Amino acid sequence: MRYTGLMGILLTLVNLLQLAATLRIAAFNIRTFGDTKMSNATLSSYIVKILSRYDIAVVQEVRDTHLVAVGKLLDELNRDIPDNYRYIISEPLGRKSYKEQYLFVYRPSQVSVLDSYHYDDGCEPCGNDTFSREPAIVKFFSPYTEVREFAIVPLHSAPTEAVSEIDALYDVYLDVRQKWGLEDIMFMGDFNAGCSYVTSSQWSSIRLRTSPIFQWLIPDSADTTATSTHCAYDRIVVAGALLQAAVVPSSAVPFDFQAEYRLTNQMAEAISDHYPVEVTLRKT
C-alpha cells in the first residue's frame, strides 16, 4: 500500500516536471463569448478549466466591448494565484455592425508581451479591405523556451472568404517580418479551413499552404468541431526555423473537452462549437 502511494506521488511529480518543461499555446473559438456565457456558472467554470491548461491562449469570437466578460474571466483565472494570467485584447473588428475581438490570455511567469499591432488590410469603408477581421498580432518573449521571441497571428476568417483570407496570411507574414525583423511566427485560429469552405482543389491557390516556409501542424483529417460535423476548421501554422524546431512532435492536436470532461453533446456545444487547437513548445 505504501509502495503504491509512493509510486502515485512520483508519477504526479514526473507529470508536473514535464508540464514545467514545456510551453503550451492554444487558439479557441468560444462561440459568442460575452457576459451571458461568463454569467453562467457551469459554462464559465468549464471555460476557465480549459483555458487554465495553457500558458498562452488566443480566444476568438469575443463580443465584449466593455470587457465585462473579460474581467470576470481574468478574476476566475487568477482566483487561486494572483496575477497568474494577464491579457491583451484587440479593438472590435468587423466590416459592419457585427464585431468580434481577439483576446490573448497569458501567464506572465512564462512569457511577456514585447509589442503588438493591428495589420492594416486596406480601407473598410471603401470596400477594399482583405479580412473580415484583420489579425491583431502580438510578439512574445519567452525566456525559458528554445525560441526566445515569436509572434502569434490570429485569424477568424469569414467562412465564404476562407480561401482568400488564408492566402492573405502570407502577406501578413511578410509584413511582420518587415516590421519586427522576425521569422518565427505562429498563425492560429478558426480559419474555416475545411469541408465546403476550403476544398481539396483550392489548396493550390493558397500561398500559406504551398510555400515551403510554413508547417501546417493540424492536418486536414482532424476534427476541430464539437458538433456532428467532421471538419478541420481550426489550424496552427508555424514559420521560422527556431519556432519549428521548438515544437514538440505530435503535440499539435485539437483538445476534445467533451471527451476529457465527459460532457453531453448539449453541454459541449453550449461551451462552444469548436475545440481548442493546441501545441507545445520545448523549454531549454
Curated annotation (Swiss-Prot):
Q: Which cofactor does it need?
A: Ca(2+); Mg(2+)
Q: How many cofactors are bound and how?
A: Divalent metal cations. Prefers Ca(2+) or Mg(2+).
Q: Which UniProt keywords apply?
A: Actin-binding, Apoptosis, Calcium, Cytoplasmic vesicle, Disulfide bond, Endonuclease, Glycoprotein, Hydrolase, Nuclease, Nucleus, Secreted, Signal
Query: Quick one: a GO biological-process term for this protein?
Result: apoptotic process
Positions of the catalytic residues: E100, H156
Can you say where in the cell this protein is located?
A: Secreted; Zymogen granule; Nucleus envelope
Q: Which organism is it from?
A: Rattus norvegicus (Rat)
Q: Which reaction does it catalyse?
A: Endonucleolytic cleavage to 5'-phosphodinucleotide and 5'-phosphooligonucleotide end-products
State the name under which the record lists this protein. Answer: Deoxyribonuclease-1
Top EC class of this enzyme: hydrolase
Q: Which gene encodes it?
A: Dnase1
CDD domains per the UniProt record, alphabetical = DNase1
Q: Where does it mainly reside?
A: secreted
**Source superkingdom:** Eukaryota
The record's Gene Ontology cellular component field reads: cytoplasm; extracellular region; nuclear envelope; nucleus; zymogen granule
Q: List the disulfide bonds.
A: C123-C126, C195-C231
Could you say which protein family the record assigns here? Answer: Belongs to the DNase I family.
E.C. no? 3.1.21.1
Report the function annotation for this chain: Serum endocuclease secreted into body fluids by a wide variety of exocrine and endocrine organs. Expressed by non-hematopoietic tissues and preferentially cleaves protein-free DNA. Among other functions, seems to be involved in cell death by apoptosis. Binds specifically to G-actin and blocks actin polymerization. Together with DNASE1L3, plays a key role in degrading neutrophil extracellular traps (NETs). NETs are mainly composed of DNA fibers and are released by neutrophils to bind pathogens during inflammation.
The entry lists its GO molecular-function terms as:
actin binding; deoxyribonuclease I activity; DNA binding; DNA nuclease activity
Keyword Calcium: yes or no?
A: yes
Where does the record locate the signal sequence feature?
A: 1-22
- Known PROSITE patterns for this protein? DNASE_I_1, DNASE_I_2
Site entry (Nitration by tetranitromethane destroys a Ca(2+) binding site and inactivates enzyme), positions: Y87
